[in-house]
Amino acid sequence: ADTIVAVELDSYPNTDIGDPSYPHIGIDIKSVRSKSTARWNMQTGKVGTAHISYNSVAKRLSAVVSYTGSSSTTVSYDVDLNNVLPEWVRVGLSATTGLYKETNTILSWSFTSKLKTNSIADANSLHFSFNQFSQNPKDLILQGDATTDSDGNLQLTRVSSDGSPQGSSVGRALFYAPVHIWEKSAVVASFDATFTFLIKSPDRDPADGITFFIANTDTSIPSGSGGRLLGLFPDAN
């Protein structure tokens, strides 16, 4: 199985797999059962911003999700990613719909990682920034139902021609270049990721959510990982 570290923007509470009984932000370490969660006042039809950061000195993974003009939601978890992830990883965004549905639209996405070693050269940095997405992106690996549209947006899950969301869809987008996330001689390994998103739903209960994730470089969508498993995990263990 893939090794996954993720921050989930979970719009549908699946209490049978340990979700709280409300939409939430969660930090997932190798399991869909979140290590830490915070209640999320999800606003359908409004553009939101998610910011995820990690610092290996503090060994803390944090996420802040906000909408313009309203209070933000923060969640954090103390974890040493050196002990969880392989040295080289890929970063991505994943989303699913199930019986209930929503659009999982990404408007922009940026990422910066820095690996500071004792040597002078700081060659192990990576930065990318998408303010819009091209029709045939060379620098993204699209998996499942993920596509880019004519408006320059990334649609992680299926939408019909009129833009309405489809159920039972799973899609992921990964940056093509692997990231050197840690090294034994590194003094500090850190990263920051930011994405803006738009979730719209005709349903009273939108589902299932958008996730920022880090995984082994050869990661693929696990069989049966749709819906509540967020396109990341083969089971709910």
Curated annotation (Swiss-Prot):
Subcellular localization: Vacuole, Aleurone grain
Molecular function GO terms recorded: carbohydrate binding; D-mannose binding; metal ion binding; toxin activity
Function in brief: D-mannose/D-glucose-binding lectin. Has anti-inflammatory activity in rats. Induces histamine release in mast cells from hamster and rat. Induces lymphocyte proliferation and IFNG production. Shows toxicity against the aquatic snail B.glabrata at concentrations higher than 20 ug/ml.
Top-level lineage group: Eukaryota
The organism of origin for this protein: Dioclea virgata
PTM annotation, UniProt: The beta and gamma chains are produced by partial proteolytic processing of the lectin alpha chain by an asparaginyl endopeptidase. Mixture of 60% alpha lectin and 40% of its beta and gamma proteolytic fragments.
Note from the entry: Binds one manganese (or another transition metal) ion and one calcium ion. The metal ions are essential for the saccharide-binding and cell-agglutinating activities. Is being tested as a molluscicide with potential application in controlling schistosomiasis. The causative agent of schistosomiasis depends on freshwater snails of the genus Biomphalaria as hosts during its larval stages.
Matches recorded under Pfam families: Lectin_legB
Free-text tissue specificity from the UniProt record: Seed.
Residues given in the record as Ca(2+) binding sites: D10, Y12, N14, D19, D208
Keywords, in A-Z order: Calcium, Lectin, Manganese, Mannose-binding, Metal-binding, Toxin, Vacuole
Keyword hit for Ribonucleoprotein: no
Main location: other
Gene3D superfamilies: 2.60.120.200
Protein name: Lectin alpha chain
Signal peptide: none
Family statement drawn from the similarity comment of this UniProt entry: Belongs to the leguminous lectin family.
Keyword Amino-acid biosynthesis: no
Quaternary structure note: Equilibrium between homodimer and homotetramer. Oligomerization is pH-dependent with homotetramers forming at pH 6.5 and above.
